[in-house]
Amino acid sequence: VITHRVQYLTKEYGIDPGDILVITFTRAAAEEMRERYEALTGGGSRVTFGTFHSIFFRILKLAYRYTADNIVREEQQMQFVRELAQAGGLEPEDENEFAASILSEISSVKGERIALEHYYSKNCPDAVFRQLYAGYEEKMRRAGLIDFDDMMVLCLELFTERKDILSAWQRRYRYILIDEFQDINRLQYEIVRMLAKPEDNLFIVGDDDQSIYRFRGAKPEIMLGFERDYPGAGRILLDVNYRS
């Protein structure tokens, strides 16, 4: 659906391929769409295909000179939380499972834009979680590292504080298409809404019955409320599986 829509925009409306941004949730899906589009059009393209994280990190690289070395590795994250738990005298049955659960909750807090004082942990007392969260952020800052959620947080802050930079990216990508929209979280959606202005040329594809990232804070209700946020939007229901 997405690839044919891109082809339609460029062929029928003469839209510059360089003005089009296609976003999905995995590198494999982004690469597959790129290949499908190039097969449709018979060659390379200036359309940008990427994941939320790759697009946001590209923006941060240009603004702040980040490199891949600034991205924290999963094992580093786990070690940070294990060290904090030990320093706090915590004795979970399984250190790795506990660390992974805490990291998932930290991701939810960031991705859902939840005030820390309003978040209730499922894995430890709330005061303990807040200490772990603050300690994790401090370790990351001292090491000069960012995680995948930080990419989005920093991008939102950049767009909010630097309207000139936001305006430049709005001019760069005048048409935004998003696949698997049911997997979007609140932070990603806020950035997309900012990026899509002032023309609001958004095209989304999703199935609210198939969200696979609920554990990461995905909110299918964002898709269900899309027409409320964009009253002029049209809806097309597909009853054919185009991937089979």
Task: Pin down the residues of each PLM region.
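P-loop NTPase Walker
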Residues: 1-70, 167, 221, 233
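ATP-hydrolysis module of ASCE/P-loop NTPase motor domains
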Residues: 44, 65-150, 173, 235-241
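Conserved helicase NTPase motor core
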Residues: 21, 29, 48, 73, ...
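Short alpha-helix boundary/capping elements
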Residues: 56, 60, 107-114, 177, ...
